[in-house]
């Protein structure tokens, strides 16, 4: 029995994503191919050169001498409780904010540096 492309599309549309993923694995094993590796490698090269970073992580490197002001600033920026903010500040090299926009990351960096902390944006 030969299926048309429309029949195959209809059959696949009725399946869940997990069922489709399982089907892909089965086909890869049966045919001895890998669907993900060549496609991902080819797509990653050109896209990386053109793509500009849009999400930044603000890392608190060191609280400096004025730890209390830095803890207050971390609490204000993140909404963390006193204990959580203190633990974050004392640990060092921890992310204060992850996935921030460039503007937000710079604002957070300036605020923490004004409080006496050493901060990096990655």
Swiss-Prot record:
The keyword tRNA-binding does not apply. GO terms for biological process: translation. Gene3D superfamilies: 3.30.1390.10, Single helix bin. One of its GO terms (cellular component) is cytosolic large ribosomal subunit. It holds the Pfam family Ribosomal_L12. InterPro entries: Ribosomal_bL12, Ribosomal_bL12_C, Ribosomal_bL12_C/ClpS-like, Ribosomal_bL12_oligo, Ribosomal_bL12_oligo_N_sf. HAMAP family: Ribosomal_bL12. This is Large ribosomal subunit protein bL12. It comes from Bdellovibrio bacteriovorus (strain ATCC 15356 / DSM 50701 / NCIMB 9529 / HD100).
């Amino acid at each position: 029995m030969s299926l048309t492309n429309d029949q195959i599309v209809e059959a696949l549309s009725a399946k869940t994503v997990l069922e489709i993923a399982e089907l892909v694995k089965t086909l890869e094993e049966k045919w001895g191919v890998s669907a993900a590796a060549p496609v991902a490698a080819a797509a990653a090269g050109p896209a990386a050169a053109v793509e500009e970073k849009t999400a930044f992580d603000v890392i608190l490197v060191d609280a400096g001498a004025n730890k209390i002001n830095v803890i207050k600033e971390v609490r204000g920026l993140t909404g963390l409780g006193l204990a959580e903010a203190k633990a974050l500040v004392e640990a060092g090299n921890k992310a204060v904010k992850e996935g921030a926009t460039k503007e937000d990351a710079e604002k957070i960096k300036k605020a923490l540096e004004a409080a006496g902390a050493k901060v990096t944006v990655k």
